Amino acid sequence: MNLTIKEEDFTNTFMKNEESFNTFRVTKVKRWNAKRLFKILFVTVFIVLAGGFSYYIFENFVFQKNRKINHIIKTSKYSTVGFNIENSYDRLMKTIKEHKLKNYIKESVKLFNKGLTKKSYLGSEFDNVELKDLANVLSFGEAKLGDNGQKFNFLFHTASSNVWVPSIKCTSESCESKNHYDSSKSKTYEKDDTPVKLTSKAGTISGIFSKDLVTIGKLSVPYKFIEMTEIVGFEPFYSESDVDGVFGLGWKDLSIGSIDPYIVELKTQNKIEQAVYSIYLPPENKNKGYLTIGGIEERFFDGPLNYEKLNHDLMWQVDLDVHFGNVSSKKANVILDSATSVITVPTEFFNQFVESASVFKVPFLSLYVTTCGNTKLPTLEYRSPNKVYTLEPKQYLEPLENIFSALCMLNIVPIDLEKNTFVLGDPFMRKYFTVYDYDNHTVGFALAKNL
C-alpha cells in the first residue's frame, strides 16, 4: 500500500499543530502569570502582616520606654539632654576580637578551674597585653558654641572642671576628624588668648582661653572655655572615639584658670534657680544616659532622695564606710565619676576580697572574671550614718556571652588613687539616680526607675 502525503495535508496538519501549540502556550502563560500573581500577592500580604506585627511590637514594647523618657524631657520644667555611652564591655569585645583572644581566655579559665594556673602567676603591672582604658566610659552628648550653634560631642565628666574643644587652629593629626570651633563665625565670641598647657601620663594638650555662648539643651550663657590648638598623645583613644572635647561638671578648685563651673555660671546669670544637676542612667539601657540641669526631675527615680555631705570642694567626694564580705574600709574617700565604667577599689582591698571569692585574673590581661553563678560573691555596701547603698553581684557582673556563656566579667577593678579612695562609676549609677548640688555641697542618691 502506497502512502501519499500531499503538500496541502502537511500544511493543514502543521497549521493545526501550530494552533494547538499556540493555544497550549497561551494557556501555560496564563497559568504561569496567575501563579506569579498569587506569589506576589502572598509575599505582599506576608510583608504587610509581618510589618504590622513588628510595628506593634516595637511601638508597644521596644519604643514604649523611649516614649516615656521623651515625654518626661518634653514636659519637664528643667533642661534635660540625652547622651550616648560607650562602656568598657563594648571596648572589651572589640579588643578581644582584634587580638583574637577569645579562645585564649576560655583556655585560661579551664586551666584555672583544674588548678593548673596559680593566682600568684596571673600577671602584674608588667602585663604586656592591656585592655585599653577598661575603666573608662565615654558619656558623650551634644552642646553648642557660639551664636551660630557650632555643634560638638562632649564627654560629660563629673571629675573635670573645664570645657575643652578642638580649635580650627589645631595643627595635630588627631584633630583632623573632629568638629572644630571657629571663632570667626560667631558674633558672640570674646577674645582672651591666655595660653593653656595640660600635661599628663597620657599626653599633652596646648590651647588658649576663649569666651563665647555655650548652650546645652534649652540653656545658654557666655562662658570661658579652652580651644585646643595642639594635642600630643592620647592615642588611639581620642582620634578613634566619637568625642570632640570634654565638658567638665566638677568644682572650681579643680579647674585650670579658676573658672566657675558652667552650672554655677547659669545660676549667677539667672538662667536657673538652683546650681544643681542630676544624672539618670536607665538600668536596662547601657548605651544611654540623661543629664538634667537646674533642678531634680522626680520622674526619674523612686523613693526618697538621700543626701551625703561632700568632704571637700575639689571632687564630688564623700566619706562612706565600704564593706565587701569580710573586707571593710572605714571612712573611705568615695568619688562619683561619670567617666568611669566600673567600680574601683584600692589594690589591697581588692586582693583580700579575691582570695576568698573565686575571682580569676586572665594572665597578661587587665581582666577579672568569675562564673556568673558564683555564690561566694557578696553584696558591696557603702554605709553612711543614715543610709546603706548596695550593689548585688548581678549589678557588678557583666556576662561574657560572646566568649563563654557561664563566664562573667567583674566590674570591680583594683586602681590605686589617693589613700583609701574608691570610685563609683557606671554600675552604681545604673542603680542609683545621682544629684550634684553646688549650692548645698552635697550629692544625692535615690533608686533609679527602670524607664
Swiss-Prot record:
<dbReference type="InterPro" id="IPR021109">
    <property type="entry name" value="Peptidase_aspartic_dom_sf"/>
</dbReference>
<feature type="transmembrane region" description="Helical; Signal-anchor for type II membrane protein">
    <location>
        <begin position="38"/>
        <end position="58"/>
    </location>
</feature>
<keyword id="KW-0926">Vacuole</keyword>
<keyword id="KW-0064">Aspartyl protease</keyword>
<keyword id="KW-0645">Protease</keyword>
<comment type="function">
    <text>During the asexual blood stage, catalyzes the cleavage of denatured host hemoglobin (Hb) or globins. Digestion of host Hb is an essential step which provides the parasite with amino acids for protein synthesis, and regulates osmolarity.</text>
</comment>
<keyword id="KW-0812">Transmembrane</keyword>
<dbReference type="GO" id="GO:0005775">
    <property type="term" value="C:vacuolar lumen"/>
</dbReference>
<feature type="topological domain" description="Cytoplasmic">
    <location>
        <begin position="1"/>
        <end position="37"/>
    </location>
</feature>
<keyword id="KW-1133">Transmembrane helix</keyword>
<dbReference type="Pfam" id="PF00026">
    <property type="entry name" value="Asp"/>
</dbReference>
<comment type="subunit">
    <text>Probable homodimer; in the zymogen form. Monomer; in the active form. Acidification disrupts homodimerization. Component of the hemozoin formation complex (HFC) composed of falcipains FP2A and/or FP2B, plasmepsins PMII, PMIII/HAP and PMIV, heme detoxifying protein HDP and falcilysin FLN. The HFC complex is involved in hemoglobin degradation and detoxification of heme in the food vacuole during the asexual blood stage.</text>
</comment>
<dbReference type="GO" id="GO:0020020">
    <property type="term" value="C:food vacuole"/>
</dbReference>
<keyword id="KW-0865">Zymogen</keyword>
<dbReference type="GO" id="GO:0005764">
    <property type="term" value="C:lysosome"/>
</dbReference>
<dbReference type="GO" id="GO:0006508">
    <property type="term" value="P:proteolysis"/>
</dbReference>
<protein>
    <recommendedName>
        <fullName>Plasmepsin III</fullName>
        <ecNumber>3.4.23.39</ecNumber>
    </recommendedName>
</protein>
<keyword id="KW-1015">Disulfide bond</keyword>
<dbReference type="GO" id="GO:0016020">
    <property type="term" value="C:membrane"/>
</dbReference>
<feature type="disulfide bond">
    <location>
        <begin position="372"/>
        <end position="408"/>
    </location>
</feature>
<comment type="similarity">
    <text>Belongs to the peptidase A1 family.</text>
</comment>
<feature type="topological domain" description="Lumenal">
    <location>
        <begin position="59"/>
        <end position="451"/>
    </location>
</feature>
<dbReference type="InterPro" id="IPR034164">
    <property type="entry name" value="Pepsin-like_dom"/>
</dbReference>
<feature type="domain" description="Peptidase A1">
    <location>
        <begin position="139"/>
        <end position="446"/>
    </location>
</feature>
<feature type="disulfide bond">
    <location>
        <begin position="170"/>
        <end position="175"/>
    </location>
</feature>
<keyword id="KW-0735">Signal-anchor</keyword>
<feature type="propeptide">
    <location>
        <begin position="1"/>
        <end position="123"/>
    </location>
</feature>
<dbReference type="GO" id="GO:0044002">
    <property type="term" value="P:acquisition of nutrients from host"/>
</dbReference>
<dbReference type="GO" id="GO:0004190">
    <property type="term" value="F:aspartic-type endopeptidase activity"/>
</dbReference>
<dbReference type="InterPro" id="IPR033121">
    <property type="entry name" value="PEPTIDASE_A1"/>
</dbReference>
<keyword id="KW-0472">Membrane</keyword>
<keyword id="KW-0378">Hydrolase</keyword>
<dbReference type="InterPro" id="IPR001461">
    <property type="entry name" value="Aspartic_peptidase_A1"/>
</dbReference>
